[in-house]
Amino acid sequence: MQSLNVNGTLMTYSESGDPHAPTLFLLSGWCQDHRLFKNLAPLLARDFHVICPDWRGHDAKQTDSGDFDSQTLAQDLLAFIDAKGIRDFQMVSTSHGCWVNIDVCEQLGAARLPKTIVIDWLLQPHPGFWQQLAEGQHPTEYVAGRQSFFDEWAETTDNADVLNHLRNEMPWFHGEMWQRACREIEANYRTWGSPLDRMESLPQKPEICHIYSQPLSQDYRQLQLDFAAGHSWFHPRHIPGRTHFPSLENPVAVAQAIREFLQA
């Protein structure tokens, strides 16, 4: 792992592929890190210069830089990009890291970021989601709230990489980070209503591809198809899978979808 000090914090990152190839940032969600992309990054590194940054406080030492919000993560990423001297790049984000992706798209504009990719972003929160987030913010009950997410995500799979991510990698993060994550995730949904509303609010809209596997319901697929019919910049792409983690479960299909969208 390499590291940079930017915006008053330490950011660690992995880097692979030809540095002269198009640069692609892989952005995880809260309480995740570069390990989320252990299956996907090598596939994409055949065609891209792949960088997987870890958010502040998500490095191997969980360096404490005080409290922060999701807007801080966007500023950190912009500072990281400047420090690396990267002008042209694309982003692929997962889960609630997608809020950061769209914040950066808004700040840089569609001329610089004509396309972006979001993976398995919860577009339509279910009623139990709010209770999970509330429990996840509680100083003593956060473990139960966190486990509720894990149980939901593990219910439909025996995929070893996904289960390892849920049992070892995500629980590794301290309780303070989980509480912060749930607070910020809830704040974004309360502010914007849904990710579709957030994307629609962009004054300059890039082409946005949503790669997803879950939920399996036809209604969820139809929601996206209906939205795409009225918004030509939105491109839903369903791939086979039974989990919230397609980059771990089905990396070949995810890599193919990314290539086809970015290279079109």
From Swiss-Prot:
Q: Which residues bind substrate?
A: W30, C31, Q32, T94, S95, W153
Active-site residue list: H244
Question: Which Enzyme Commission numbers does its entry carry?
Answer: 1.13.11.47
Q: How is the cofactor bound?
A: None. Contrary to most other dioxygenases, this enzyme does not require a cofactor for catalysis.
Q: Quote the record's note on pH dependence.
A: Optimum pH is 8.
From the Swiss-Prot or TrEMBL record, give the protein name: 1H-3-hydroxy-4-oxoquinoline 2,4-dioxygenase
Q: What organism is this sequence from?
A: Pseudomonas putida (Arthrobacter siderocapsulatus)
Determine the domain of life of the protein's source. Bacteria
